């Protein structure tokens, strides 16, 4: 049996009714990754229609591959959304959007959103798969939090020849770029150490 990452808790379900809107404002045609943060207004209105299948069929590698595709700026398939009664329903692309939400919120089926959804009762197998997914993502891409740190503090990043997706390794909370590595010392300051580009 294949091991799947359970991302079903990340987008709540709701009854999908098409209601004519009298609003004159058009919904935004694009969204930013920060719109998927747990406390973001856009994220709070996301819903999966009841007829959507569970978002629990992707392997850890497939979740990692999709997040990597996004992080490296490659083309990803469109996600189809529908606004109705103040909610934004995901008509197509629930797995893709859930994978990004998982990365942004560090919740691969075992984080705070999932714990609340499952009333803090998460199967050990689900926790194990979530940890495996997190490890794969942190190794190859880096956590969203580390990417945000790199964006907010570019002066702490030493320019190098590595691909951006390889730059951050949250498993040891350091930033690696080019032939240098920044690592937090015991005193809390960043120290650079020689390091080759990760493969």
PLM regions and their residue ranges:
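N-terminal leader/domain-start detector
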Residues: 1-42
């Amino acid at each position: 049996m294949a091991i799947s990452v359970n991302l079903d808790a990340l987008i709540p379900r709701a009854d999908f009714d098409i209601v004519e809107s009298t609003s004159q404002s058009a919904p935004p045609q694009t969204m930013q990754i920060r719109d998927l943060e747990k406390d973001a207004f856009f994220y709070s209105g996301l819903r999966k229609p009841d007829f959507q299948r569970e978002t629990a069929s992707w392997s850890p590698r497939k979740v990692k591959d999709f997040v990597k595709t996004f992080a490296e700026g490659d083309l990803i398939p469109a996600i189809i959304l529908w606004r109705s009664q103040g909610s934004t329903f995901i008509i197509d692309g629930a797995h893709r959007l859930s994978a990004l939400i998982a990365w942004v919120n560090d919740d691969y089926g075992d984080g705070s959103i999932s714990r609340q959804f499952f009333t803090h009762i998460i199967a050990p197998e689900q926790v194990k798969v979530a940890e495996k997914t997190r490890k794969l993502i942190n190794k190859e891409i880096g956590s969203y939090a580390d990417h945000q740190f790199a964006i907010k503090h570019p002066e702490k990043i030493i320019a190098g020849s590595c691909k951006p997706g390889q730059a951050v390794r949250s498993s040891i909370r350091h930033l690696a770029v080019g032939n240098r590595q920044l690592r937090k010392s015991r005193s809390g300051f960043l120290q650079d150490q020689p390091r080759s580009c990760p493969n």
